[in-house]
């Protein structure tokens, strides 16, 4: 043996005499050397050692066994320490172990010890909770006394995982009585290791021990008291057997298996049969339903040791019927039988007890058997003291034949008695069976009513101390619902052998333990489960049968004994664990559902998993054995799991985790937006987010013009240029191709800035055929001389919107040569309705100076006889209302130099006889009313020859755009008295400025009949110098009604040479009917050079939005035919000089209508070479941005056929009073007939190319490009006229303007649509420049005239 073991052996040999004294505080205490030596070898495992026992200080026997682990020894020693009543420790020499203080006195010196006799009572309570061990404690204490020696031996065994038996020997000089009362709580649980502590005390001591282990289920209470008077020397041997396996998988002797049955584990220990059912939730066993001929029972699976106490606590329901109250039956019997496990008695009168040999028990009977039933019933008649109706309770015994007898006694304690609480309403009543194994007294309590009896005689009669238990109920001809509700049932098993199957590595049960039960001395074959466990991956290692002395390993049998036995089989785990997990697909950026690694292991230990290769963002949680987290990167990863069990068996499992992105990116919603045109917008941020964390690509479509998308910053910005509402679509795409589409609306509203670019193209074809035939006869005599003063008052209401202004200056040099011969007679009636819509705007200033030299030659044959003298004064008032809408406003200022040469040949013959020298005063009162519906017939013969030379200079600037639609109704009444004589030479200079807004559409029908007699003598020389400037910008629709009243009274004598200067300004709304026939031959070559200077200052605001798309192609065909016949007879005699006053009132009602069909096909070609030099100084505060696109295509075809016939009747009544002095009388009669047929064919071709460039040093930029091609060919001859012309004009204009201060350029008016343009300055400047040009032109002409006269 080892050195330490030898020292331990020696310490045991000298245990009685060797003590150690040491000081604890002020006191001296003693400690056995055994304790000190034992702890010298603590923690050293050993396989076997010998304990030598020696009589009178010698040890003669060596025993071997298994040792305990170091932790078990420490636990045992600690418990010993607790069980010894410590008294004191020296402050300077604290002992390593507890002090074996056996009621010792304080030692005053080191030489004497006094020990007194005492009585020892030991109460031991052990509490364990839910561990994997079973603990059964049987404590037997034998105490022997003699005057000199007392030896106390305690045998304690338990089926813990460790085995601990202690052996002690001691001597006490006095009598001792030892009493032990041990209470322990234990059960089956899953704790790996436990420490069981057994305490043996041989000297008379008073010790209380309480040990707590982590388990609790069963309560074992053992009370043992014994005394002895003979001197006895007892020795118990402790087998410190330590397992050689890694864990202390121990077996314990099952000498006292205390079982607690409750509703939760009832099925583990008890079995139902027959009609019985069990409800675990309530713990109720229903033995019979409320039905006939039923039997149900519940039996205990193991035997009850009658030497140990047992206790049943619960409730019983006997139903709601009993004898005398519905004849209920049969009752419930509780039987204790020495027979076979699971055996039950008969039903009926036997109440589950009869039929069992040498059994005993207690019954609750609801049916009284007054007479003895038949022999097969195995029951005698019930006693008479419980007859007369009502349920009763009583003890019952059976004989060897199984015939049951209801026990009666003279003592009320155990005599049969009726129940104080009869069954009602299926109510549960408390029921309790309490048996004391020491006194053999059984006490039964039902609803507070008690029966008590000592059943030791029945136990002796049965021939055994081990009994099976059954609870039985039945019904026959009477019924009842009969139930037992379990509370707890505590008992001690007997004649059982427990077999465990333990993992050698972990020390845990591989499969639940099996309990074999039977009768004492019965041989039972047990199964080591080797085949089944091999299939589970275990190899058989060894068996421990140290607590089953009757075990035969060869035959695998065990012989049952009163004491419980235990056999343990050990197995080694050789199978690696497995992990079940499938390939996974998860979404990036989202917290995943945990991937649980389902680990399966045949072993009882824990499995450790090592996980590698996880995707970014994931981790392994060993506590839950799952993979958790949020993946952050897309891709596929191979994950490896290495699983290792406690036996170091390993397995490797791989699977894939594919991180994908199937979620489309999210876009922060963008609400509908709006802004003003030409106003920069605040950037619109497109906020996107993707679960992958990667960048998102945005594609934006449907942006309004002027806005752009910046993909770098994901913003929409810019300046919108078009008014309107757009739907913007955003398509957001992540790296995986997932798309999200978002839309919102963007509205661009009006602002003070706009852009316009206009492109228009027009093609027009026109063809006209006109045929006219006229017969006219006329005789006329007239003398007239007139001065007309006309006053016109016009009121016009107009609405005008102008969308563009432009300023242009040009200087042109034009040379024109023309030769023309024309002769035409035509009558045509044309009714034209035209609707034109144009969106254009220009403002131009132009000054033109033109010189023209014209030579003309004409031949004319004319015969006329006329004498006329007339003076008249006319005053008219006109009122017109018009509404116009204009899209064009223009101001032109131009200066041009033009030279024209015209050759004309004219032949005229004239016969005139006129004598007029008169002074006349005439008063005339005329009243006329006319109604006409006539056909006019006219016959005239005229022969005229005339020779004339004409020279004219003209300067004209006219811009006119007009569309008019008017209807007029007029009534005119005229009263006139006039006398006139005229022989005049007149020269006139007129400056006319007209602004007209006209839209005309007229329907007319006229009927006239004319009778005239006139005589006129006239001689005239006309020189005309005319300069006119016309500015017209009009688009009007007018309806007018006019009433004209005229009153004139005049006396005039004229023989005058007059010059006339007239300045007229007209604003008119007109209704027009046109009749035209034309035939021309024209060849034009022009070259113009113009120079201009302009100064302008204007403020303007232009809001222009132009959208135009038109194509024009028109064809028209017109055929007009008219026939007119008129006859006229006029006789006039007048005095030569007259003063005339006339008052004229006229009312006229005129309705006209015209229809026309025009076919025109013309081609014009023009060639021009123009050089323009322009100097311009502008001061402008306006900014106008115009961008307009216009494509115009128009196709029209019209066919018109007009036939007209007019009939006129006129009735005139005239009253006049006149006073005249006249020296001449003239009578003229004339008949003329004229018939003219003409045919004219005209073809013209011209080519015109014009290109103009201008530069303005201002804030404005203007660019014009014009290309024109014109070809004209013309030939004509008298008679029938056919005209074809075709022209093509293409113009492209682009204007860009800037307006800086729109607020100053336009004043807002109420919503009338009117707009005030501050262009008065421009008008004044224009007028000034025109005046200067005219004065310069006049001065130049005068100089030329002076040069001619000097020449």
Curated annotation (Swiss-Prot):
Propeptide segments, given as residue ranges: 1313-1351
Signal peptide: 1-89
GO MF assignments: calcium ion binding
PTM text: Proteolytically cleaved by a metalloprotease. Glycosylated. It is probable that most of the Ser residues in SSR1 and SSR2 are O-GlcNAcylated. Sequential glycosylation by sugar transferases are able to generate complex sugar polymorphisms.
Keywords in alphabetical order: Cell adhesion, Cell wall, Glycoprotein, Peptidoglycan-anchor, Secreted, Signal, Virulence
PANTHER family xrefs: TELOMERE-ASSOCIATED PROTEIN RIF1
Protein name in the entry: Serine-rich adhesin for platelets
Gene source species: Staphylococcus aureus (strain MRSA252)
Source species taxonomy: Bacteria, Bacillati, Bacillota, Bacilli, Bacillales
